[in-house]
């Protein structure tokens, strides 16, 4: 059995020892075994019991000589040097360099043999190397040789040219072509292998990208919660500072009143009326007293803007939720994954946290549905069918932390927050000068402009909370017609749609105001003079939406068109149309999005002029029932939100 194991050794060392000897010395295993038997018998003979005294004396004398020899310094140095020598040095001392190289190439250890990968390729490594070589020289020589044989059909004497190639040459040519075909097959297999390898790498990269995206989403959620807590602390600090200032002002006023009353005690008795006592206060002290209800523009600046939506493909859905039970009439957001305000015909105004997709509260106070709204930092303005405009300060919201975190896994929503918000104290004041429903509004800084069905525009001062001036649209149109700037109230000769809002859209910036009305006109006002500075004629239907920047003004109308105006020239820069009326529109630096009576959002790329659709209706024919028609859209930094007729609100990347 042992012999069989030695002969069948996978490394083949026994065969090598039998053939080449031990360490290349020519001594085989049989010689070693014979030498061992001789040493054993000799030692047994010398050390065993024997009756010959000369033999034992001879052995003792030999041991004494060996001991004396080992005590010499030269012998000890040799023994110590041999003890420090490694087995590798011993092998190198016995084998030459060429023999070592030959053994390293011809014999491999078992560890390396086990690590050899399985050969699943149809071609060898050498064939792959040959296939990668450039055969340009072969093609060049091959074409030259064939062209020489076919250059002339006859010689100069008119005789036949050289006869065709011999059979040997044709066979050689065929072998060469066959070899080239084999190389082509090897190259095809190599290309296929590279494609498979690239596909695997792409799949791995996609998995890695998804993992990093999930990590980024978690970081942004944690960042939003931390920033929410920081804003709460900042608001508390501001409130405490205001309370301290108010207490100091009241103390100063009380001290001044006491001093005044003490100095006049000998002249007349103190009045029993508190109002009479207050009359002795200094007017400067009154001016220092804070207003019980004032609008605080606390600019909520993001320390780092969300970037998760920028890493999704355009048209990807981010969130979708049932926001209302009826048609969405207005919506707006402050920044991507921030705060969103929605209003619908169900007479509710809701505040949403887009980071978690949950409603954080209601803005209650209107007696009818809200038709228009806007959020800027922490301030929200809402215009309703009850002819009022209300201002809300979201920084006054009270946040209560929930300590009960039991049964968190039973919640259907995987994302939850540890706080709930009460918006009861967010209302600042109401602006109620209109006599018709408010259909459009816009504010910037401390200036707010509202448009109503009473055919007027009102300019409001948000610091004082009162109307500064009223702009009569009909009077301005009549004045422009009398001066010849406008041909008539309706230049197209068409009656406006009865369901269309008289004031469809407004936007203000500093002293500039743009207003779109039901006659299809876009008027540019100067708020300092209250006069129309310029009128843009082009739409044949009521203007439903508009927005302008430093150079262009974009308008959408129920005449199914969107027009881009050049504010410097006062002329049309570009225009395009859709199949149905445009009800809502907004643009950013890259795209213009619009709701045009379909179940998708219409997107227009400014750079290349490409039109494409975004929304749930893109694949509705394949997935199931058609979604509802989109009524309102808003766009901020590539983050798109859209509200539908069935009350669903969805967020998309754009």
From Swiss-Prot:
Q: Which domain of life is it from?
A: Eukaryota
Which ranges are annotated Low complexity under compositional bias? 249-261
- Give me the segments passing through the membrane: none
Q: Which UniProt keywords apply?
A: Coiled coil, Membrane, Mitochondrion, Mitochondrion outer membrane, Repeat, WD repeat
Q: Which PROSITE patterns does the UniProt entry name for this protein?
A: WD_REPEATS_1, WD_REPEATS_2, WD_REPEATS_REGION
- Kindly give the membrane topology term recorded for this protein: Peripheral membrane protein
Q: Does the record carry ATP-binding as a key word? A: no
Q: InterPro entries given for it?
A: G-protein_beta_WD-40_rep, WD40/YVTN_repeat-like_dom_sf, WD40_repeat_CS, WD40_repeat_dom_sf, WD40_rpt
Cellular component per GO, a single term: mitochondrial outer membrane
Q: Where is this region: Disordered?
A: 135-165, 249-274
One Gene Ontology term of the biological-process aspect is: mitochondrial fission
Q: Where are the WD repeats?
A: 323-364, 365-402, 433-472, 478-535, 538-575, 577-614, 623-654
Q: Which CDD domains match?
A: Mdv1_N, WD40
Biased-composition ranges, Basic residues, are 139-151
Coiled coil (residue ranges): 209-247
Subcellular location per UniProt equals:
Mitochondrion outer membrane
* Repeat found in the keyword field: yes
- Pfam families assigned to the protein according to its UniProt record, in alphabetical order: WD40
Q: Which family does it belong to?
A: Belongs to the WD repeat MDV1/CAF4 family.
Instruction: Explain the purpose of this protein.
Output: Involved in mitochondrial fission. Acts as an adapter protein required to form mitochondrial fission complexes. Formation of these complexes is required to promote constriction and fission of the mitochondrial compartment at a late step in mitochondrial division.
Identify this protein by name. Mitochondrial division protein 1
Gene name on record? mdv1
